[in-house]
Amino acid sequence: MKWSEISVHTTNEAVEPITNILHEAGASGVVIEDPLDLVKERENVYGEIYQLDPNDYPEEGVIVKAYLPMNSFLMETVDEIKEAINNLLLYDIDLGRNTLSICEVNEEEWATAWKKYYHPVKISEKFTIVPTWEEYTPVHSDELIIEMDPGMAFGTGTHPTTVLCIQALERYVKENDTVIDVGTGSGILSVAAAMVGAKDIQAFDLDTVAVESAKQNIELNGVSEQVTVKQNNLLDGISGEHDVIVANILAEVILRFTDQAYDLLKKDGYFITSGIIGQKKLQVKTALEEAGFDIVEVLSMEDWVSIIAKK
């Protein structure tokens, strides 16, 4: 079978939404070639468990590659992808070069080539993310292993916004906490929350692809008893009081429900936000404070920030 390799040259800021667009278009596997992976700070802090080849990466920007089957609808699908990517400009997302190219690959090449980009990665004091096909032995007795299948939707969990969220969950979630995961995507944050002791986690996403992806990853990691995944628009219709709300989505979306998040948290509860590009940090901080939150910590990695607020 013949496959088309779709390559989008963009920016780090646009990687996650473009990845989601490609998966929704039917991509079977996505590769992210980000030169920042070669020099990430966490190499020094945690130590990467594999070596990267600089020849596989662009000199600037980020290349997102996706694989679509060759068929009569391919160019129509490509046009839809281009339109969806261009619509990201409405959210003030920098698309950089924003070029798209196509080349043909054999199934044998596709089935093995993209796996070379995915290896176990230690992303925090406790957590290591491991692709499902990799054999991995924990280095420490208290190491927590999250298994992910990068062939599924919504990436591998090693994007800075996800890493910052997991580091915050590790720090602020307590045993038996109740947690809401807004815009769950792959479900990785719900998995992490369960692994650090949360007893009841509600994971929401408006996208049906995300809901199914999250369910699979939650089952894969053995935390189905603690996590419930449902299709829902942000916090609409949600009630009760909760210990932690976590949201790794665009800054503009976070701004829509800061008041709702405040109302749904217990006293001294935490709102962990991420997906915020550095230039929008002040805007989100101001909105959180106006909603009544106290800012307790701001974590940063590359151009991204995670803001932790307390009720």
Swiss-Prot record:
Catalytic activity: L-lysyl-[protein] + 3 S-adenosyl-L-methionine = N(6),N(6),N(6)-trimethyl-L-lysyl-[protein] + 3 S-adenosyl-L-homocysteine + 3 H(+)
Superkingdom of source: Bacteria
Cysteine-cysteine disulfides: none
GO cellular component: cytoplasm
Enzyme Commission number: 2.1.1.-
InterPro entries: Ribosomal_L11_MeTrfase_PrmA, Ribosomal_PrmA_MeTrfase, SAM-dependent_MTases_sf
Cellular localisation: Cytoplasm
Single GO biological process annotation from the record: methylation
UniProt keyword list: Cytoplasm, Methyltransferase, S-adenosyl-L-methionine, Transferase
Family membership: Belongs to the methyltransferase superfamily. PrmA family.
Task of the protein: Methylates ribosomal protein L11.
Protein name: Ribosomal protein L11 methyltransferase
